[in-house]
Amino acid sequence: MSYLRFDKTLMTNLEESLQREILRTNKAGAYHCTTIVDCNTRKYHGLLVIPVPNIDDENHVLLSSLDETIIQLGAEFNLGLHKYQGNNFSPNGHKYIREFDCEHIPATTYRVGGVILRKEKIFVHHENRILIRYTLLDAHSATTLRFRPFLAFRSVREYTHENAQANREYQLVENGIKTCMYPGYPELYMQLNKKCEFHFMPDWYRGIEYPKEQERGYDFNEDLYVPGYFEVDIKKGESIVFSAGTSEVTPRRLKQTFEAEVLDRTPRDSFYHCLKNSAHQFHNQQEDEHYILAGYPWFKCRARDMFIALPGLTLALDEVDQFEDVMKTAEKAIRNFINEEPVGYKIYEMEHPDVLLWAVWALQQYAKETSREQCRQKYGELLKDIMEFIRQRKHENLFLHDNGLLFANGTDKAITWMNSTVNGHPVIPRTGYIVEFNALWYNALRFIADLVREGGDVYLADELDAQAEVTGKSFVEVFRNEYGYLLDYVDGNMMDWSVRPNMIFTVAFDYSPLDRAQKKQVLDIVTKELLTPKGIRSLSPKSGGYNPNYVGPQIQRDYAYHQGTAWPWLMGFYLEAYLRIYKMSGLSFVERQLISYDDEMTSHCVGSIPELFDGNPPFKGRGAVSFAMNVAEILRVLKLLSKYY
C-alpha cells in the first residue's frame, strides 16, 4: 500500500482534489507546483517556474501547463483541466484519472476506453528542467499523443493577457522547438525523445481563472499563449519523454536522464521521508552561496526564518555539512550587518532585532549536535562578536538597558515574527521589552559564557554570567504576573496581558530565568489555552481580539494572521518544553501530538506542512503551501524523541 496514493473517487471530486497540491523544486530556486489533477489554481502554479535574475528577484512562470490529448481512430480525448468563468472546467480530463501516486515521483494513471496511459513527472535537480514520461500501458488500436503547451513568461506576482508584443516566432530544434515570448527571458526548449511533428497554430486561451487567488481577494484570471501542438505516435508498452527547460537537450538521452533522476530520489514512503524530502526543497544555492527559503511558493530567504529553520532542516537529518554551508553564507551577511555595511547577500530582514539572537540559538543547536569544542573552533569568534555588538548597543533597534533587559521599538514597524501590517502600521505593535527577545538574550548570555569559559576565556565568561544574573532577575520581575504566565511585552506602563505563545521559549530553551515551578505554570497555560492538534495558537480564545480564521482578502487575513491562528513551528518548541518538564513520562503525549502532522501528508501540499492553520476546528491549513520553520521544527522534535530510545 502506497503512503501517498489517491484513488479515482477522490481525484474526480474536484472539491477534494483541487485542495491538494504538489511541489517539486531544484537547488537553484526553480520549482514545479500545481494540484494533483494538474489544474492550476494559483498564479504561482506552473510546470516550469524559474528565477530570472536579469529581470528581478522573483520567480517567473515560463510553462504554465501542458495539455495532453489521446487520439485513437479519429476520436480525441483531452486530459487537460482549466477553470474558466462561472465555475466552468474544461476540458475535464480529470474524469479519466484512475489513480494518482506520488510516493516516488508524481504519477497519474488515465483510462480512456481501452487505453491506459501513465504520466510521470520529475523536476531535474541541477538544472531548470521538467521531464514528463508517458507510458502506454494498454491500447487496442493505433494511438497518437498530442501535447499543447500553455506559455506564460511572466512573474509569479503578475498575470499575462493577450497582447501584440508577445513574440510568436519559434525555431526548430532536434525533436522540438525553442521559443521566447519577451526580451530578457531565456529561451524555452520543448523537446521529445522521439521524432515528432510540431504544428504551428498560435492562439490565446482567454479567461483562465485561479480560484485560490480569488479566495485571497486578488485578481484571478489571465490569458495564456499556446504556440501550437506536438504530435507523436506511441505503441503499447512504449515510453515517451517530454522535456521543457532553458537549454537544449540531446533527445536520445532523455530516457536515461529520467531514470537517473528517479534513482536519485528518496521515496516519500513514510512521515519522516516526506519531511526529509520537504526539508531539502528549502535549500537554495546560488553559485557558492547557500540559503534557506522561508517557504513556497512566494517566500524568499528571511533571516529569522532561516536561523530558526536551519537546525531542523540540517542537524535533525544528520546533515552537519549542510548546516555549515548555509552558515558560511549567513556569517558573511551577519558580519556585514554588524560592521554597518550592506548585507550583500539575498538574506532579507537581517535588521530585525531578534535575528542575531536566533543565530546564536542556531549555533547552540550545532554545538549540541557536534560538540562545544567544534562550535567554539568554528564559530566562537562570531558568537563573541555578536555578543559585543549587542552589549555595546550598536544595533539600531535593540537597546540593552541597565536592568539587563533588551528594549526594541515596534510601535511604528513590525519587528517580531508577529509581523502583519495594515496601512503601514503593525497589527500587533509589540514594543518595549518583548518576552521572546529577552528569553533569547538570557539563553545567549549563558550559552556563550559556558562556551568561552571552556575555551579558557574566564574573564569574558564571568562578565556574561554576571550580566545574565541581572537579566534573569529583571526578567522575572518584569514579565511574570500573578496568574503565573508571562506578559507578552512591556513598554513603560503599557503591559500586554494577552495569552500568547511567545512565553513558551522560556521553557524550551536550555537556559531560562524561570525555575521549574514557574516553567510548569507557563507550560500549563499554553497547554490549556493555546494547544491545538495542528499547532500552537497565536492568541488565546479567552483574550480580546481572538480571530482564528485566516480567510478573505488580504486586509482581513492580515488582521487574523497572529490573532488566534495555529502555527506548527511553535509546536516544536512547545513539545521540547514539554519534554523538559516531564522527560520520559511525556514521550507518549509528544508522540500523540505528532499524529495530526502525519495525517497532513495527504492534505494541502502533499508531503509537507503549510504555513499556518485556523485556530478552531476543523483546523484548515492556510497560507504558503510549504513552510520551512514548520517542517524544521517537527523534524527537530522527531530527533529529540529519537534520543530517548
Indicate residue ranges for each PLM-predicted region.
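Inter-helical turn/loop segments and adjacent helix faces that build the functional surface
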Residues: R252, Y366-K378, F447-L464, A517, ...
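Terminal accessory carbohydrate-recognition/targeting modules of carbohydrate-active enzymes
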Residues: M1-P267, P297, M306, E319-V320, ...
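Aromatic-rich carbohydrate-recognition surfaces in CAZymes
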Residues: D138-A139, T160-N163, L172, I234-K236, ...
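Non-catalytic C-terminal accessory modules of carbohydrate-active enzymes
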Residues: L79-I105, V112-G114, Q392-H395, D524-K534, ...
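Carboxylate/His-rich catalytic cores and anion/metal-binding grooves
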Residues: A244-N277, I308-P311, D318-K328, R516-E529
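Glycine-rich, acidic and aromatic/proline-enriched surface loops and short helix-turn segments
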Residues: N277-Q285, K328-N336, D599-V606
